[in-house]
Amino acid sequence: MWSRLAGTVASLTMAFGTSGCALFERTLEPGAILNDCKGCPELVVVPPGSFDMGAPGGEEGRPEGPVRRIDIRAPFAVGRFEITNAQFENFVDATGYAPAAACGVWGAGSWQYPEDANWRDPGYQRPPMPDEPVACVSWLDAQAYARWLADRTGLAYRLLTEAEWEYAAKAGTRTAFFWGDDPDQGCLYANMFDLSGAAKWGFDWEPVDCDDGFAEASPVGALQPNAYGLHDILGNVWEWTEDCYIAPYLDSLVDGSAVQSDGACDRRSVRGGSWITRASRHRTTFRGRDPEDTVFSFFGFRVARDLTAEERQRFSGSKSQQ
C-alpha cells in the first residue's frame, strides 16, 4: 500500500511540481508578484495594516497633518515599478489615445512648454529609453491607462489612493525616508536630484551629497526597493494618486479610501519626488498638488489593483502595524 502511495505522490510531484497547485490552492503571501497579461505591469501584493499618516509639520502652504491613524483593511496589489515608456506605448498603439502635449521641460535656464514636448520627448536632451518611467503624462493620461488595463484584463486596475501610497512607501517604517532619516544615504534607493543631476542641469537647489549615476530618469528597478518590494516609490518621477488634494487632511476619512470632490477638483495629489526634486520633498509624508491636466518632464505614475475575491481568500499574511 505504502509503495503504491509513494508512487502516486511521486507522479503528482512530477506532474504539478512541489507546490501541488493542481490539488491545493497556493496561498498568496505579502510580496508575491502578480502578472495579469503579456505586457501588463508586474504587481506586488501589499498586506493590510494600520499606520500613522502625515506629519505634524511640513513646508509652508503644504500641510501634512493632522496626523491620523489609517486602517488599510484589505490586501491590495501595487505596481512593482512605475509605468514605463514601453508599457505606455503599448497602450497608445492599441487605443489611438492622444496623451497631453506641451510638456514642461527645462531649457535656456527656465521652464519651457514647446508643443512638441511630450512623453516621447520629455526634454532629457537625449531619447527616453523603453525601460524608463513614462513622463510628461497628466492625471487624466494615467487614468486612461488604468482604465485600459481594467478593460483588457477584467480586473480592478486604478491609481493608488494617497493613503495607500504613503502606506506602501513607508513599508513599515517611521523615518523620514524608508531607508532612514539621512537623505544623503538615499542614492541606493531613490533617483533624486544628486551630484550627477547638479552637474548636468545646474538648478539652484542643493543636491543630495551622493550620486546614483543618473542625471534624469533612470530605468525602473535600477535602484534597490523598499521592504515591500516596490522600486522607485521615492524618486525617479512623481506619481499621480487618485485623490483630490485637500488640506488639512479630513479627520473622518481613515479607511485608506480616496478623497473625492463633490464638484470639479482643481488639484490632484502627487507623491514621491523625482530625479529633479530636492531631498526634503522625497519624505514619505510630503504632499505635492497639481491640476489634473499638468504635464512636466518629471510626472509619471504607477498603478494598483484590488485583489479578486479568490485572491483575498488565498491571502495568508498578517496585518501590518506601523
Identify the meaning behind each predicted range.
Residues 35-112, 116, 130-141, 235, ...:
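A short glycine-rich, aromatic-capped structural motif
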Residues 297-311:
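Short, structured beta-strand segments at or near domain termini in extracellular proteins/domains
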Residues 52, 56-58, 98-288, 295, ...:
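Functional-site microenvironments in short loops/helix caps that host divalent-cation chemistry
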Residues 30-41, 203-210:
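Short aromatic-glycine motifs in intrinsically disordered, low-complexity regions
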Residues 19-20:
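C-terminal motif of bacterial Sec signal peptides marking the signal peptidase cleavage site
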